[in-house]
Amino acid sequence: MTTRLELLPDVYLTAVQTSRFKTACFSLSFLRPLRAGEAAMNALLPSVLLRGSEKTPSIRAIADRLDELRGASIGALVRKKGEIQLTGLFADCLEDQYAGEAVFSHLLDFVSELLFCPRTEHGAFVPELVSQECRNLQNAMQSVLDDKSAYCEIGRAHV
């Protein structure tokens, strides 16, 4: 069963429930019109959010926190559907019944912390982290252009 909740205008939480797997997963997505002036910044946002929060200020601290959640994982989500850009975070963890504790709710709280209390300096994202993630995004885009088979697959997806 899939549950999709609109938390705020154009902000959705999607949770998939099934007994087929021993893991639980969810995604939190922002839907934005695809605009040339915003696309790169929208694509950058999830990676910057994954660089830390007020309470968990580093990648290392995030990794430690995920380890405490029985090896849960969180990743960036960037997709294009027609003229809509979908960006956000996805997460998965061991189902509570197999973990013997409430891992899912703690993971949901942690993702909320990353989203609503990001690591900032003077009321804005940390400039150094934004620059690093910008370079990472540029390198990832260049690596797709350099890999002819990957580039071909992108072309096929849009035909």
Feature annotation, model-predicted:
Residues 2, 144-145:
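A generic local secondary-structure boundary/capping motif
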Residues 22-35, 40-42, 59-113, 139-142, ...:
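M16 family metallopeptidases and their MPP-like homologs
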Residues 1-25:
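N- or domain-start disorder-to-order transition segments that initiate the globular core
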Residues 43-50:
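Active-site SXXK
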Residues 52-55, 96-99, 117-126:
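Short, polar/flexible loop-turn hinges at active-site or ligand-entry regions and domain interfaces
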Residues 47, 113-116:
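Short, hydrophobic/amphipathic alpha-helical patches that form generic packing surfaces
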Residues 63, 117-141:
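Acidic/histidine-enriched alpha-helical segments
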